[in-house]
Amino acid sequence: MSTNKINKKSIARIAAVQALYQNILQNNYDMYDIMQNILACYHSNSIDLPKNFKISLSISHFKMLVKSVFENINKLDEIIDNHLTNDKDPVHMPILLRALLRVSICELLFCSTTPAKVVINEYTDIANDLLNEHEIGFVNSILDKIAQENNKIS
């Protein structure tokens, strides 16, 4: 029997988006508690998966992403808001989309030795699983634009 595995950093990215989403939903509930709850969930394998499917996350990558987002949250929100088109209202941005953008932009700009194209592809894949079609294109577009503006890709 083969065991399906997903890259530990990919799982850490998903978990970081979950943590930020939960933080927004719970009105800025203590981030440390949210991180501990999410880590406990992943460690206890309480996520409903097929028997031959294993997931584990890079704890260090998860913690680094979440902490970096909180250290840079005002700057991240400013970057997001500055990249919205006139028809997009930052106040009405879906919570999950904002959480995903905060984490992805943070990794892209502040805390990654991973090539920008890999980061963009990873978060576009995550968006594909979590968001609607229009939002997926928006995530890909905004990350690509931010990477180009910051000389992360040519």
Curated annotation (Swiss-Prot):
Keyword tags: RNA-binding, Transcription, Transcription antitermination, Transcription regulation
Alphabetical list of CDD domains matching this protein: Terminator_NusB (cd00619)
GO biological process: DNA-templated transcription termination; transcription antitermination
GO molecular function: RNA binding
GO CC terms of this entry: cytosol
InterPro entries documented for this protein: NusB-like_sf (IPR035926), NusB_fam (IPR011605), NusB_RsmB_TIM44 (IPR006027)
Stored NCBIfam families: nusB
Role: Involved in transcription antitermination. Required for transcription of ribosomal RNA (rRNA) genes. Binds specifically to the boxA antiterminator sequence of the ribosomal RNA (rrn) operons.
Family the entry assigns: Belongs to the NusB family.
Record's protein name: Transcription antitermination protein NusB
Native species: Rickettsia typhi (strain ATCC VR-144 / Wilmington)
Gene: nusB
